[in-house]
Swiss-Prot record:
Name of protein: Myb family transcription factor EFM
Expressing tissues: Specifically expressed in vascular tissues of cotyledons, rosette leaves and cauline leaves. Not detected in the vegetative shoot apical meristem.
Location of the HTH myb-type domain: 230-290
PROSITE patterns: HTH_MYB (PS51294)
Subunit relationships: Interacts with JMJ30, but not with SVP, FLC or CO.
Lineage: superkingdom: Eukaryota
Keywords: Coiled coil, DNA-binding, Flowering, Nucleus, Transcription, Transcription regulation
Its biological purpose: Transcription factor acting as a flowering repressor, directly repressing FT expression in a dosage-dependent manner in the leaf vasculature.
Any GO CC annotation of this UniProt entry: nucleus
Induction notes from the record: Up-regulated by SVP. Down-regulated by high temperature and gibberellic acid treatment. Not regulated by photoperiod, circadian rhythm under long days or vernalization.
GO biological process, alphabetically ordered: flower development; gibberellic acid mediated signaling pathway; negative regulation of long-day photoperiodism, flowering; regulation of DNA-templated transcription; response to temperature stimulus
Disrupted-gene phenotype: Early flowering under both long-day and short-day conditions.
Residue ranges the record marks as coiled coil: 36-81
């Protein structure tokens, strides 16, 4: 760029007419040409400096280009008219040359717009007007030529001013493109019908090929499925004889938990039997043997091997050895009905045969109360009760109306009192 003294922000842009007026008076003198040349050289230098930044400074480049073009035109006009004395005559060519300069970009733009419209027409129709050159046709791609003619005809109608509200008009035949090779001259209607027939034939051929391919694929799939089914091995059916051999092999090998499928297959000696089949059958057999088999208890069968009494397991030999001997526990249960209504079954043994247990709590409290009263009352009360108990059998024996059940009840009551007195003595010793 130039120095700061030469460049400033006070520069006001002037129109082209003002520039012409400023230099119109000095065209006859020679220093004017030198001045114009100096300005042109300086502008060109500035343009070269900004050329590297023309994308960032597009307006500056445009201003410099316009100024350079204006000064060039002025310099050429001054040199051409330097011999003329009339200033007005000398300035007229400058104005005539200057006016087209402003309209020149518009012409180029119009050319570009015309080229774009023609390109759109080419891309949307298969025909071209007569005034289009072959060179412009060669610049078009092939994809644009193969587009449908109906769309192009519709677009052409819209450009000519016809809208959608006009009546429908029949399609008109249009001339062919220059690029197409003309082998035969056929009317457009025949070409259209032939094209339709060709398309129909190609579609029919494609459908036939598609059907043939589908049939071939279905046949190949059917053959492959049948071959795969034939190659697939049938599932092994375990007959009773085969299962019997399997069980025998397990017994020889020491059980299902020890035997291996390979050993079982070798012992069974069956043709076509594989290790996988033996393995699957062995797994099913193990699952079947793990299930607990239900054992229904019959009424006439033998008794259980173990007897439960009060949470204690008693071996069966004790029940067989002491099963038939009557005990005091049986009489107490039978006469007083403290625990059950009847005697226990014969295969159960009574608890007092093996260990001594305290009687139920209600009789115990009752006898404690009696002993407490006896001890507080003195020895006379106990002797009186004892004499009453001992004398009662004679009285009962004398009375003919009393039965044997009452005598048994009194004897059981006497034995029970003796047992409770012994138990109370043992409890006293335990307390001390």
């Amino acid at each position: 760029m130039a120095s700061s003294s030469e460049l400033s922000l006070d520069c006001k842009p002037q129109s082209y007419s003002m520039l012409l007026k400023s230099f119109g008076d000095n065209f006859q003198s020679d220093p004017t040409t030198h001045k114009l040349e100096d300005l042109l050289s300086r502008l060109e230098q500035e343009r070269l400096k900004i050329d590297a930044f023309k994308r960032e400074l597009p307006l500056c480049m445009q201003l410099l280009n316009n100024a350079v073009e204006v000064y060039k035109q002025q310099l050429e006009a001054y040199r051409a008219n330097s011999n003329n004395n009339n200033q007005s005559v000398g300035t007229r060519p400058v104005l005539e040359e200057f006016i087209p300069l402003r309209n020149q970009p518009e012409k180029t733009n119009n050319k570009g717009s015309n080229w774009m419209t023609t390109a759109q027409l080419w891309s949307q129709s298969e025909t071209k007007p007569k005034n289009i050159d072959s060179t412009t046709d060669q610049s078009l791609p092939k994809d644009e030529i193969n587009s449908s003619p109906k769309l192009g005809h519709f677009d052409a109608k819209q450009r000519n001013g016809s809208g959608a509200f006009l009546p429908f008009s029949k399609e008109q035949s249009l001339p062919e493109l220059a690029l197409s090779t003309e082998v035969k001259r056929v009317s457009p209607t025949n070409e259209h019908t032939n094209g339709q027939d060709g398309n129909d034939e190609s579609m029919i051929n494609n459908d036939n090929n598609y059907n043939n391919n589908n049939n071939n694929n279905s046949n190949s799939n059917g053959v492959s499925s049948t071959t795969s089914q034939s190659n697939r091995k049938a599932r092994r059916c375990w007959s009773p004889d085969l299962h019997r051999r399997f069980v025998q092999a397990l017994q020889m090998l020491g059980g299902s938990q020890v035997a291996t499928p390979k050993q079982i297959r070798e012992l069974m000696k069956v043709d076509g039997l594989t290790n996988d089949e033996v393995k699957s059958h062995l797994q099913k057999y193990r699952l079947h043997t793990r299930r607990p088999s239900p054992s229904p208890q019959t009424s006439g069968g033998p008794g259980p091997h173990l007897v439960v009494l009060g949470g204690i397991w008693v071996p069966p030999e004790y029940t067989s050895a002491h099963g038939g001997t009557p005990t005091l526990y049986h009489h107490q249960v039978h006469h007083h009905h403290t625990n059950t209504a009847g005697p226990p079954p014969p295969h159960f043994c009574s608890s007092q045969e093996f260990y001594t247990t305290p009687p139920p709590p209600q009789p115990l409290h009752h006898h404690h109360f009696q002993t407490f009263n006896g001890s507080s009352g003195g020895t006379a009360s106990t002797d009186s009760t004892h004499h009453q108990v001992t004398d009662s059998p004679t009285v009962e024996g004398k009375s003919p109306e009393s039965g044997g059940g009452e005598r048994k009840g009194l004897a059981a009551l006497r034995e029970e009192c003796e047992d409770h007195s012994n138990i109370n003595g043992s409890e006293i010793t335990l307390k001390f």
